[in-house]
């Protein structure tokens, strides 16, 4: 039996603007297992990014629970949430959000610096990760000197620097050409297998999602249950 890492229990999310209520998520239940690679697919506006943000404590559910390793993420202090984000979760976005004035090495090491780790040890770990993603020769380059695919590889290494239990990726290949996008997905799979890190990847591309261990579909705020699970 697989060990459950993250549980989403009856999560709903709505926004209110005066008398108008917009329902974004409706009673979503989901389990993410340790070390698995899960894709969530759906069209724009289906609610998949909102779900990912709630899983990462970047947005709060209107109702329901999210538990990481048994800990209810919305019953802890904001300080504890910040600690969880930095220590137990990694994030990858469509746009890399690298700090432009810092080198690839410094960008990867930054979350470890924020955590208060020894700078020399943090940079040593960052070097190992950059070599692992094929950028050992680009460590001293700033983001403007890197290609789009290289910048996203730096972002993946940064997401892994604190050895998170779970990495949440929101359209990680959405800003890349097809070849670079495929390379990023292969890298995610390779790293997940090597490190035992769980990945949840939100994407609109079913072909890329099919490479993951499991895929689920969001539609109009509902998580579709595969026929095999019904």
Swiss-Prot record:
Name one molecular function that GO assigns to this entry.
ATP hydrolysis activity
CDD domains noted in UniProt? ABC_MJ0796_LolCDE_FtsE
Q: Which GO BP terms, alphabetically?
A: lipoprotein localization to outer membrane; protein localization to outer membrane; transmembrane transport
> Does the keyword field hold ATP-binding?
yes
GO CC annotation terms, alphabetical: plasma membrane
| Cited SMART domains | AAA
Q: Which UniProt key words apply to this protein? A: ATP-binding, Cell inner membrane, Cell membrane, Membrane, Nucleotide-binding, Translocase, Transport
Q: Does the keyword Acetylation apply?
A: no
EC number(s) from the headed UniProt entry = 7.6.2.-
Q: How does it sit in the membrane?
A: Peripheral membrane protein
Class in the EC hierarchy, top level: translocase
Q: Which InterPro entries match?
A: AAA+_ATPase (IPR003593), ABC_transporter-like_ATP-bd (IPR003439), ABC_transporter-like_CS (IPR017871), ABC_transpr_LolD-like (IPR015854), LolD_lipo_ATP-bd (IPR011924), MacB-like_ATP-bd (IPR017911), P-loop_NTPase (IPR027417)
Give the UniProt subcellular location, in the record's own words: Cell inner membrane
**Domain of life (superkingdom):** Bacteria
Residues annotated as binding ATP are 42-49
Give every ABC transporter domain span.
6-230
Primary role? Part of the ABC transporter complex LolCDE involved in the translocation of mature outer membrane-directed lipoproteins, from the inner membrane to the periplasmic chaperone, LolA. Responsible for the formation of the LolA-lipoprotein complex in an ATP-dependent manner.
Q: NCBIfam families from the entry?
A: LolD_lipo_ex (TIGR02211)
Q: Which family does it belong to?
A: Belongs to the ABC transporter superfamily. Lipoprotein translocase (TC 3.A.1.125) family.
Q: How does it assemble?
A: The complex is composed of two ATP-binding proteins (LolD) and two transmembrane proteins (LolC and LolE).
Indicate what this protein is called per its UniProt record. Lipoprotein-releasing system ATP-binding protein LolD
Provenance organism? Shewanella oneidensis (strain ATCC 700550 / JCM 31522 / CIP 106686 / LMG 19005 / NCIMB 14063 / MR-1)
């Amino acid at each position: 039996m697989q060990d459950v890492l993250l549980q989403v229990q009856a999560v709903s999310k709505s926004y209110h603007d005066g008398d108008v209520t917009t329902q974004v998520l409706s009673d979503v239940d989901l389990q993410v297992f340790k070390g698995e690679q899960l894709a969530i697919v759906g069209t724009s506006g289906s609610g998949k990014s909102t779900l990912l943000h709630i899983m990462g404590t970047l947005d709060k559910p209107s109702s329901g629970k999210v538990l990481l390793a048994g800990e209810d993420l919305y019953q802890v202090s904001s300080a504890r949430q910040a600690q969880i984000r930095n220590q137990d979760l990694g994030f990858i976005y469509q746009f890399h959000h690298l700090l432009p004035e810092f080198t690839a090495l410094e960008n990867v090491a930054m979350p470890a610096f924020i955590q208060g780790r020894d700078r020399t040890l943090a940079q040593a770990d960052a070097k190992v990760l950059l070599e692992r993603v094929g950028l050992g020769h680009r460590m001293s380059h700033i983001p403007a000197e890197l290609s789009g695919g290289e910048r996203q590889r730096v972002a993946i290494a940064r997401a892994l620097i604190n050895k998170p239990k779970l990495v949440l990726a929101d359209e990680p290949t959405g800003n890349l050409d097809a070849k670079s996008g495929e390379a990023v997905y292969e890298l995610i799979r390779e790293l997940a297998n090597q490190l035992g890190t769980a990945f949840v990847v939100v994407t609109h591309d079913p072909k890329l999602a099919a490479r993951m261990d499991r895929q689920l579909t969001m539609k109009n705020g509902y998580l579709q249950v595969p026929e095999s699970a019904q």
